């Protein structure tokens, strides 16, 4: 599969160039995270500090634009892959392990203990401690339900698949986590 990664492109701009993407022989397009962000700036990293598990942000586009993109891409046989951020939320600008004030209050109950990772060569620390942002307890059943609802909504819009950001920071099933099984 030939995947074109259109990092930070607006959904409407991608939709407009679908015929050209097909002409160039691509089978899929990976889009940037479409979750809410802590402000409307254009810095790339804002997309990787989500405030919610909802579709739409000022940088990439709205849910309606995602549906239009998926419909247009589908008509050309092109799959849409959405980059998603589920391990952490946006941090406060000064206290990075504290959630930003714009983080969805419903998600705050799913935050993990705010202990910083001090050894990135220690697998347990990388999968159970914070890596510079407020981290979610991805093994919490309530959080998993929220994630599943979000992914189902993306699939209903026509998204074909996902790229999961920070995958190395999730424990595997053989390490006692069922999170990745819930996603599949």
Describe each PLM feature range.
Residues 3-5, 162-167:
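Short catalytic-loop micro-motif centered on adjacent basic/acidic residues
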């Amino acid at each position: 599969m030939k995947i074109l990664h259109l990092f930070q492109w607006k959904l409407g701009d991608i939709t407009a160039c679908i015929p050209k993407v097909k002409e160039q022989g691509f089978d899929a397009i990976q889009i940037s995270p479409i979750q809410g962000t802590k402000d409307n700036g254009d810095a790339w990293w804002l997309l990787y500090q989500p405030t919610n598990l909802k579709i739409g942000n000022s940088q990439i586009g709205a849910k309606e634009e995602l549906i239009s993109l998926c419909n247009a891409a589908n008509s050309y046989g092109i799959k849409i892959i959405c980059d998603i951020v589920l391990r952490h939320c946006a941090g406060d600008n000064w206290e990075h392990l504290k959630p930003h004030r714009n983080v969805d209050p419903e998600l705050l109950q799913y935050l993990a203990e705010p202990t910083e990772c001090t050894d990135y060569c220690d697998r347990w620390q990388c999968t159970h401690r914070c890596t510079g942002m407020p981290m979610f307890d991805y093994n919490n059943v309530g959080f998993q339900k929220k994630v599943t609802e979000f992914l189902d909504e993306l699939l209903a819009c026509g998204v074909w698949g996902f790229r999961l950001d920070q995958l190395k920071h999730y424990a595997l099933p053989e390490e006692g986590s069922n999170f990745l099984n819930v996603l599949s």
